[in-house]
Amino acid sequence: MRNIRSGFIWLLVALVGAFAFAMLALSRGEHVNAVWLVVAAVACYSIAYRFYSRFIADKVFELDDRRLTPAERHNDGLDYVPTNKWVLFGHHFAAIAGAGPLVGPILAAQMGFLPGTIWILVGVMLAGAVQDFLVLFISTRRDGRSLGEMAKQELGAFAGVITMLGALGVMIIILSALALVVVKALADSPWGLFTIAATIPIALFMGIYMRFIRPGKIAEISVIGFVLMLLAIVYGGNVAQDPYWGPFFTLHGTTLTWVLVIYGFVASVLPVWLLLAPRDYLSTFMKIGVIIGLAIGIVFAMPEMKMPAVSRFIDGSGPVFAGALFPFLFITIACGAISGFHALVSSGTTPKLVERESHIRFIGYGAMLMESFVAIMALICASVLDPGVYFAMNSPAALIGTTVENASQVINSWGFIVTPETLALIAKEVGENAILSRAGGAPTFAVGMAHIISEVFNSRAMMAFWYHFAILFEALFILTAVDAGTRACRFMVQDLVGVAVPQLANNRSWFGNLAGTTVAVAGWGFFVYQGVVDPLGGINTLLPLFGIGNQMLASMALILGTVVLFKMKKQRYAWVTILPTAWLFVTSMTAGWQKIFHEKPSIGFLAQAKKFSTGIEQGTIIAPAKSLKDMETIVFSNQINAALCGFFMLVAVTMLIAAFFAIRRALRAEQPTAHEVGAALREEAGRS
């Protein structure tokens, strides 16, 4: 009887989800209620977690709670600590959820809400959550080893070193893209910058409070920190209007880049408990709380999605990013469906904290579903805005100009009606001087979120507060990832350099730490600066590189997972990883090839470099450049991007070839050859 009731409930969930999808897909030019998208997403996540993740856990991985985890075997109170699964879920989610799920879906909305919705949901169920689950599992079975170390074990030393180099390159690009989003959101925004700056002393106070005043009172200090942040948002409006402090906190992009680089360096070398840990707690509560609150707000407000299901820009002519739906929609959405960055987290701190093997499913598969839900919320925030407002915020100034009158005229010619008065009014409502060309996705998410919450309360009087609350929320999302990512990048640099200079590999050496941090910060700081001074806007060139590198790293993680399944003699289940691997590999390689060699300057790095090089030779200034120096910057940026893209492709192909030979050897072997740590069973540990 119980099985019948359970089956009926899940059948009902499936039917409701199918009906919601039908409402989204079959709209004929009519505005669709955003509630249907929330319902479809929740139904998909529920079914995928209940059935597909259980199948993987029970049949493919055979998770066994009798096996001691690395946290139990090496419990040292420092790196290896058995952690409650709910606490670890929050830690893991805070680490993986950066700007990607917020930015990618918003940019992808230029093609309409339906293509992005389908990939976010299908991609996370069959690829993204599978990758996170897989890497966390194989790392836990190998004492929490990193992705590069596992590749070295399973594929050979050469493939391992290549993987480590590729992972470091991708990490630098990821951090630079995240930091550039922060710069784009806070440049010339005194209210936003003051609010974010205020979180630093707040986090320091929280760190001291938890360590010396009230140790262990995480919930207590998190509430205090949250209240202090709300006060900072409120007071930020006064700061922006102040004749002295307003200009003081009004920083241009280049200055803000240097400030962020210095902050990243200091945050990376400070003790974790002083800044990173308290910000981690705050961001976890903020991330999960705000996303759930936003979903509830959508249910109550029931806003209509004004963006068409499929727009005219699926042909690749869109102003937000260039390129056709395949492959560029998939690399643009990136983290909302699958992220290679997660493979670094899932083989970093998280496997050293897992308390039971059965928790891997909840933490690995479940946290990625939560991040995908963040992507759905971002897509909704972009889609509930008038398309004219959306394109005004996300199109480069080179296309729409710098005045509301010019922007309105250009966007109207695209078939999306928006008036200068509307653009000026929205800027005034959110407390900004202008909203034009605020690329990067963060401002668009903030305006969309403020719009939804204002509809819940049926008042637009608080639009400015909710806008800056959303900016704070996003910045916490991003800065948490930048903080943790810079520290992880430092470890990767030290590991690589330590091969030649062993002293630098010592994480307890101040010289090694400072040297590694300097290289890491200089790496991502360089690309942020290039993005800021790029006359094309930076986002348009850096984010495709971020997406390609990120997706290639994900395909590499899945390739490693496929090899491990063959070496475990689980080849009958290898389709679980082979299918997403094949799709990701083809997509990312196609995107990489097009970004390097495409004949259109709006798409191909080399074509764009050639276009502006020719202009320099002829002494002709080509818009949006305003000088020959601007054109030289564009040429240099495109040449660097093409070289990096080619490097990522070479790394992925090298790993695929190494995997092919490793699988051949595994098939010839009669016994499993996977390099797992010997199983210590809980009963045996208790008797010994």
Predicted regions and their residues:
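Extracellular loop-to-transmembrane helix junctions
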Residues: 31-50, 108-138, 148, 191-203, ...
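Helix-loop-helix module between adjacent transmembrane segments
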Residues: 90-96, 123-143, 147-148, 152-221, ...
